[in-house]
């Protein structure tokens, strides 16, 4: 089976597992989607491969964290080190999300992978906030702020290596060199 760190891995987008993946349907998500995602995680664990919960839009973050906690709490996955979560640095709650994941890993006595990315769906996040008439945006509106948030998240993750296996994804050469320098 090899080592989970060198074996292939898979990323799963929770919204692909249930059409109504939104907080208003939390009960349905936990009753229908969570068991599907748990089954996939168990299969990944049996193959000793990585299994990442991919990032979603910011308004789905709390729901994703509920699903993540339910899966990580499964006793069958206790000894598996291949569970991962993708966190988008451009989200204004990214730092708190990293803290929450660390606290969860401590509570459950688990080690998890966290992949930090800059973020996706920026245009959609901005448009949705405008359409809803929100007083603020859930994501940083300037690229420079997202870049700084990414580096702050990287620094934070590198300080959590007793519980978190940090992973970094970026297309920006400056960000790559900065993360290497931080490490």
Predicted regions and their residues:
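Positively charged, amphipathic and often flexible ligand-engagement surfaces
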Residues: 1-183
């Amino acid at each position: 089976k090899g080592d989970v760190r060198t074996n292939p891995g898979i990323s799963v987008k929770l919204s692909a597992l249930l059409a109504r993946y939104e907080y208003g349907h939390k009960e349905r998500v936990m009753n229908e989607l969570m068991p599907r995602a748990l089954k996939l995680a168990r299969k990944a664990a049996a193959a000793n491969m990585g299994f990442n919960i991919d990032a979603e839009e910011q308004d789905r973050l709390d729901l994703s964290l509920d699903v993540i906690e339910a899966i990580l709490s499964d006793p069958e996955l206790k000894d598996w080190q291949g569970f991962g979560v993708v966190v988008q640095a451009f989200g204004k709650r990214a730092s708190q999300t990293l803290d929450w994941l660390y606290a969860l890993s401590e509570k459950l006595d688990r080690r998890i992978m966290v992949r930090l990315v800059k973020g996706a769906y920026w245009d959609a996040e901005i448009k949705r906030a405008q359409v809803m008439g929100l007083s603020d945006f859930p994501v940083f509106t300037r690229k420079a702020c997202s870049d700084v948030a990414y580096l702050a998240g990287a620094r934070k993750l590198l300080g959590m290596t007793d519980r978190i296996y940090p992973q970094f994804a970026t297309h920006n050469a400056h960000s790559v060199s900065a993360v290497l320098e931080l490490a």
